[in-house]
Regions:
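Aromatic pocket-lining residues of Rossmann-like dinucleotide-binding sites
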Residues: 2
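S-adenosylmethionine
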Residues: 6-7, 11-133
Length: 134
């Protein structure tokens, strides 16, 4: 979506080959400039500068921070979609990490039985990521 909207450099890492084929087909069909890398983020080691690191349903926050930090040493702006337990994950992560965090309500909602919108999650916007004591 970011590449379709005009972002000039989008790099996607996906370990599932079937999803990679789908993403590659979308890139081809929409003539956008995204690059799809089939592999695990834990083993990705190509030197790049990232402006943003975005993840959804990948890992607990503490692990996401570790992965992000290994990619760019805390320089990128991280956008992580998290569910109901985000507060506990944030408390746990702050034991190891210093960071600036903004919490944005997710626009993803479901209708409850009372037909009212039910909260489903947040987007954690994290900058200035640093390992405590490091």
């Amino acid at each position: 979506v970011l590449s379709i909207m005009g972002c000039s450099s989008v790099f996607l890492v996906e370990s599932n080959k079937k999803k990679c084929r789908f993403l590659s087909e979308v890139v081809r069909a929409t003539n956008c400039s995204a690059v799809v890398h089939n592999g695990r983020i834990e083993t990705y080691n190509d030197a790049r500068d990232f402006d943003y690191i975005i993840a959804r349903a990948l890992a607990p926050l503490d692990r996401l921070l570790k992965l992000s930090f290994s990619l760019d040493r805390g320089q990128a702006r991280c956008l992580f979609l998290k569910g109901r337990n985000y507060e506990q994950e944030l408390i746990q992560a702050k034991k190891k990490w210093n960071m600036d965090v903004q919490i944005h309500k997710s626009l993803s909602f479901t209708l409850s039985s009372s037909a009212e919108k039910e909260f489903r999650g947040v987007v954690l916007e994290i900058t200035n990521l640093r390992l405590k004591g490091g």
